[in-house]
């Protein structure tokens, strides 16, 4: 994957971003992400910093940037970075967020980060119910659940779900766990966000049984219909089978690992 840099942006657009954010220093590259967009951090005159991401307007992923901006405009205050600015001009889509000083959590067995993450996930949904983003699609239309049609009712709900809770979309800072990158948000039942975390725990080294024990600490997951969770495990595994060979190399490698985790989870659920 060829990652674009700050210098790839037109000079006029760079000045617009700098002025709008009241930046006081150079744009420093930020590593990470599965997209080829620009990712930089910029110091501001208020003593804080902004995280800026940008992608050409013609890129297939530009729509996700626009969706992420639209969702963030509706989110209530909470454990997530504030949207500071958005620009859709000069053939680029640019988003600027409050920079969160923190680290990605360790989800491995025995990690002290695990209870922090689980508590944060449990607290995430009440402020997002009812769903504040009117254009959020129901999760029953997500490609993950194509094989789980008999369990659509258990997946329905009016909570805004993150739908991509992974270690790299979480930051632990001075004020707890923050959820970043809301581009895939859907509307549905709160247990789904927890179910999506289960394969991530398996990827981090947990057995499927242990991963489910941790997930069950969240009431929404503990109270979810057992057969719906099993159908979901099967569906997400099928989804990764279909997607394992797609995307940029980094994403393909992740999806192949996720597929192994999904198969282990499905086998455990159907034992």
Regions found by a protein language model. Give the residues of each.
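An alpha-helical support segment within catalytic cores of ATP-dependent transferases
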Residues: 9-20, 123-163, 173
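A conserved alpha-helical element in kinase catalytic cores
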Residues: 14, 35, 48-90, 106-124
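Active-site Asp-x-Gly
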Residues: 159, 173-213
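Regulatory N- and C-terminal appendages and interdomain linkers associated
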Residues: 1-21, 257-271
């Amino acid at each position: 994957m060829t990652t674009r840099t700050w210098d790839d942006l037109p000079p006029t657009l760079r000045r617009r971003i700098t002025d709008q954010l009241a930046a006081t220093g150079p744009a420093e590259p930020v590593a990470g992400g599965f997209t080829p967009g620009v990712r930089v951090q910029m110091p501001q005159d208020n003593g804080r910093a902004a995280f800026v991401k940008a992608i050409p307007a013609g890129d297939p992923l530009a729509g996700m940037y626009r969706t992420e901006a639209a969702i963030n405009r509706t989110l209530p205050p909470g454990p997530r970075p504030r949207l500071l600015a958005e620009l859709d001009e000069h053939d680029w889509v640019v988003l600027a967020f409050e920079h969160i000083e923190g680290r990605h959590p360790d989800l491995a067995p025995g990690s002290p980060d695990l209870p922090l993450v689980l508590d944060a996930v449990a607290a995430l949904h009440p402020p997002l119910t009812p769903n504040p983003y009117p254009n959020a699609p129901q999760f029953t239309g997500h490609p993950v659940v194509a094989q789980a049609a008999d369990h659509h009712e258990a997946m329905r709900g009016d909570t805004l779900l993150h739908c991509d809770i992974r270690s790299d979309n979480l930051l632990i800072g001075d004020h707890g766990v923050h959820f970043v990158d809301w581009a895939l948000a859907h509307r549905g039942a709160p247990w789904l966000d927890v179910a999506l975390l289960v394969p991530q725990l398996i990827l981090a080294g947990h057995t499927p049984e242990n991963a489910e024990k941790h997930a069950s600490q969240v009431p929404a997951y503990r109270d979810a219909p057992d057969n719906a969770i099993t159908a979901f495990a099967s569906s997400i595994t099928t989804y990764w089978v279909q997607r394992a060979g797609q995307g940029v190399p980094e994403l393909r490698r992740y999806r192949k690992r996720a597929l192994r985790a999904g198969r282990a989870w499905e086998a455990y659920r159907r034992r």
